[in-house]
């Protein structure tokens, strides 16, 4: 059994917790870690932007990753 991680950027803790709870309820993941206050710096529309985001890291089996990705995209 191979374990893998998915790194998900969310706007805030509430959103990350809702996603984690849903994925756990559906038994798609084994565990979730939430990291608040991540600073992201990126280029958008020709300018450098800076935002604070919350990171959700989920742990799952490799064969479940496509299901996890699909569920996250629906949220």
Question: How should these model regions be labeled?
Answer:
Residues 1-75:
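Positively charged, small/polar-rich N-terminal and surface patches that mediate targeting and assembly
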